[in-house]
């Protein structure tokens, strides 16, 4: 069988390739690779250098913020700071420096001294000389507020008036001494010798605001018993016999009831206890004498308070006495059915500038009433308190002289019954 190819057209045989020989690379691709590597390395280097410069700049800025960064001292030992105060009276001060150049002179300012900032001398290679800083100027003392600064301002005229009032009070106290129950009872005994219709009621113990009504009613009941010839039911006085007391009750037409008052106690027992305590101490304290006159003949209740409203207001006292007057109308009725009336004697404070003349004022008012019960002698009192008490002092001296011969705590003899 014949081959399809022509036998005459023969091709040259291809020699076999040797597998051991290396395949050669062209030089152009190799140069391009080297250029890429070089460019990459250059870019990386530029980036590193840029970052390094940035870090170096920020590091230098941080170092510059420290206080020791810009100082040129070679030594690590910190130089002491010298503060030089510049007071007014002192001469100009020179700041000493360890260096050879002369120190600059700090001239004194024309304005008042102010706190001087600390001056740091420049450092030198040599060791600085130790120096002691001068003492700081004393601080201005803080204003101290005294008790006078805290008190309100009082005008001088007020002190003058207070001094005059104090001097006036001392003068009045020297003119009129305090009267106790013994002097008052002696004064009543003396008044009985002048006016037979007055009964000298004992003032030991005296009546109080809590029992004066019961005492008045008891005396009027005993008077009715004497007029009827019956025995008395009330208690007898300490220093008076029953016969003498009955004679006094028979002829009396006026009952002077002295009341002892103190604002602290609120009951009768507490009042008597306070009275004993003050008597032991020998002090009057805040006690006060009051007077209630029971005028049987004129059918009238007269209330006198030299302090005007020490116990209660005059309006309240008048209402209370009006109620008591109605009770007396039933206890001791009049033959002509006349009713008891009430009168508040004092219209103002009588004992101005005095705290212990109340007993003497009660006796003075009683003496005025005995002389003329229908004339108000209080309207004629002097306005000046010193002059008023000078007149009272004259009455006191006359009474004290009159009672010197009277026996102690002894009732005067009343007239015999008819």
Swiss-Prot record:
GO terms for cellular component: extracellular region; host cell; membrane. GO terms for biological process: protein deneddylation; protein deubiquitination; proteolysis. GO terms for molecular function: cysteine-type deubiquitinase activity; deNEDDylase activity. It is a single-pass membrane protein. Pfam families: Peptidase_C48. It is an enzyme of class 3 (hydrolase). Residues 86-141 have a biased composition (Pro residues). Residues 1-23, 72-145 are annotated as: Disordered. Keywords: Hydrolase, Membrane, Protease, Secreted, Thiol protease, Transmembrane, Transmembrane helix, Ubl conjugation pathway, Virulence. Residues 1-11 have a biased composition (Polar residues). InterPro entries: Papain-like_cys_pep_sf (IPR038765), Peptidase_C48_C (IPR003653). It is found in: Secreted; Host cell; Membrane. It comes from the Bacteria. The active site is at 288, 305, 358. Its EC number is 3.4.22.-. The keyword Protease applies. Effector proteins function to alter host cell physiology and promote bacterial survival in host tissues. This protease possesses deubiquitinating and deneddylating activities. This is Deubiquitinase and deneddylase Dub1.
